[in-house]
A protein has these predicted regions:
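Hydrophobic core segments of transmembrane alpha-helices in multi-pass, intramembrane catalytic enzymes
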Residues: 161-170, 195-198, 215, 342-351, ...
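Active-site catalytic microenvironments for nucleophilic, acid-base chemistry
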Residues: 87, 204, 351-352
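Membrane-interface alpha helices of multi-pass inner-membrane proteins
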Residues: 181-205, 327-334
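Juxtamembrane/interfacial segments around transmembrane helices
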Residues: 69-71, 169-175, 192-199, 245-249, ...
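Alpha-helical transmembrane segments in multipass membrane proteins, preferentially the mid-helix core
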Residues: 307-312, 340-356
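Aromatic-enriched
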Residues: 70-78, 350-457, 466
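Primarily membrane-embedded glycan-assembly and transfer machineries that use lipid-linked glycans
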Residues: 2-182, 210-340, 399-400, 426-442
Length: 466
């Protein structure tokens, strides 16, 4: 095993500094929770709703109205999983249609607590092992920023199944497992937990990994059928109908709805809404400008990712596999809003990149910035009284208009644009240097012919994967 080259001087001090800032944000969030009774912004603004995604989903895993009453977008696997790792008697079936009926189980279902936090710790160990395998020098800083950063902490506070799906994602696409079949299973599990993670699978076709994609799709279908047979509900039509309905409901009606997000969808909804006087606050000219400028930036970044995908198809052997996956994943995540915690997915792949080239360096630094659990207040709203779960009492909460909801989606877009441009540059340089003389190096994927060029391409891909 060769010793990795020493990282450039900027990386030696900058990454530890950024990780230290992330640690400071974690300490501040913990201090605020202890002294004020709730987590500060940018965490969710309802202090009583901690772990709500886990325990409400666990309740509806037992209520037959999962898809027609609660209108969930989760495939059956999520509910089967929560049935297996929860106490049945903690979830008596309630009358009515209370979407938060599972919150009462938080004081009873201790296996749920243990499972959620166990997967959180498992993720920390997995990402450290993966990054140590790639570059031991930067591994501690990147692993800490990802495992203890804002996206993962937000997922933990919400009790969202991103914590479990993330485990499946890193085992499917990280370098820890050697068995391709086992990787297929974890890829199928990840998709059955979070449907949009299919965007991490299809980019493998750009690298001509036909059998890998076929195996993962078969595993996905088999896992779905088994979980559907267990749960007894959750047909593809029900899931698709609920996803379409959910997308129609996304938006913002007040400034508090501009919370922790990955895209500008909520802001655009608020700008175009007649329920909130944004024109009176920033002026009609600025509103009209933002309604044109923000979509233009989004479309530009989406086009750059598509162009990068085309470039990968032409020169698949010169682009690292983790970046190929990330391009498809980021295209999905910037196109449809799925929550701020989903940033953990693409940050995982960004931190696999080497500290080389302006675009990649920017993406790495920006990923650290997204991991900082802090925000900058711009203005203050009136204090309100809210119930809190820790402590079990009512508290006075001061809400602020923060900078984060306006800046974080832009940082996400710059990361996507940076890796797209870095990919286009890599392909362009290879085309100028080598022309088309070795274009048959991937021919064995189509015909049973192995050439020296094909072997060279496979070796280069393996080196990139390491």
């Amino acid at each position: 095993m060769t010793t990795p080259e020493a990282p450039p001087s900027a990386s030696r001090w900058l990454e530890p500094l950024l990780a230290l800032i992330v640690a400071g944000g974690v300490v501040w969030a913990g201090y605020h929770w202890i002294t004020e009774g709730f987590l500060p912004q940018p965490f969710f603004y309802e202090p009583f709703d901690i772990w709500a995604d886990w325990f409400n989903t666990a309740y509806w895993a037992r209520d037959p109205g999962t898809y027609d009453t609660w209108r969930t977008i989760y495939p059956p696997l999520s509910f089967v999983f929560l049935q297996m790792f929860g106490l049945e008697h903690c979830y008596p079936i309630a009358t009515g249609t209370d979407p938060s009926a599972g919150l009462m189980a938080r004081g009873c279902d201790w296996p749920g607590y243990v499972t959620l936090h166990a997967f959180f710790l498992i993720n920390a160990v997995l990402v450290y092992r993966i990054y140590k395998k790639i570059d031991p020098r930067s591994a501690p800083w990147r692993a800490f920023a990802l495992a203890a950063g804002l996206p993962m902490l937000d997922g933990l506070e919400r009790g969202n199944l991103i914590i479990v799906s993330f485990t499946c994602l890193v085992l499917a696409y990280g370098p820890l497992l050697r068995s391709a079949r086992l990787r297929w299973v974890f890829a199928g599990l990840a998709i059955n937990f979070k449907v949009y993670l299919i965007a991490a699978l299809f980019p493998l076709l750009l690298r001509r990994k036909w059998r890998w994609v076929e195996g993962a799709l078969v595993a996905t279908v088999m896992i779905y059928l088994l979980s559907y047979a267990w749960l007894g509900r959750g047909t593809p039509k029900e899931i698709v109908d609920n996803i379409l309905s959910f997308n129609d409901q996304l938006g913002a009606a007040q400034l508090l709805d501009l919370w922790y997000a990955t895209t500008y969808r909520a802001l655009l909804s608020l700008l175009g809404s007649s329920n909130f006087p944004m024109m009176d606050i920033i002026g009609s000219r600025n509103v009209d400008l933002l309604l044109v400028l923000i979509p233009a930036i989004q479309y530009t970044v989406q086009a750059s990712l598509i162009a990068a995908a085309v470039a990968i198809w032409l020169r698949p052997e010169v682009v690292p596999l983790y970046r190929v996956i990330n391009i498809g994943l980021m295209l999905a995540l910037i196109t449809s809003e799925a929550g701020g915690y989903t940033q953990a997915y693409f940050i995982f792949f960004i931190f696999m990149e080497r500290w080389k080239g302006f675009g990649i360096k920017w993406a790495i630094v920006a990923a650290y910035v997204l991991s900082i659990p802090l925000d900058i207040p711009l203005d203050r709203s009136l204090p309100v009284v809210r119930p809190a779960y820790f402590p079990n009492t009512t508290i006075i909460v001061n809400y602020y208009i923060m900078l984060g909801p306006f800046v974080r989606p832009l940082i996400v877009l710059t990361i996507a644009f940076a890796i797209a441009c870095a990919t286009l540059r890599t392909v362009w340089l290879d085309s100028r240097a080598n022309g088309w003389r070795d274009r048959w190096r991937f021919a064995p994927d189509v015909t049973p012919r192995v050439t020296d060029a094909a072997l060279d391409g496979q070796a280069a891909a393996s080196a990139d994967a390491r």
